[in-house]
Amino acid sequence: MKNYLLSVYQPEGTPPPADVLEKIMAELGALRDEMRAAGAWVFSGGLNAPSTATVLRFDRGDMLMTDGPFAEGKEYLGGFTIVRAPDLDSALEWGRRLAQVVTLPIEVRPFVDEAGD
């Protein structure tokens, strides 16, 4: 089994109305419960807006701190889920299900394992 990162990318701007967001969150909770029951769920979390980020950069002996996101963009990492799956196809299926619930782009990426692949 391998771990995969399912990254949720959301656009800048106003979040959905409360009634829409409540429905999404309920469906997201049901999907998380299904992932747990299948032994696939490892961890998940939502992130605050990019404006709350702090970037740390070590440069020639100095630690530089910058407020705001590392890169400016129209979409940003809004949350993520880590799943354990036997193969990429299984991880992609969880990613597909997540994309259907949140209606946002999902990037599926495997973690580097100890063997280095």
Where are these predicted regions, by residue range?
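Conserved, structured core segments of small domains
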Residues: 1-117
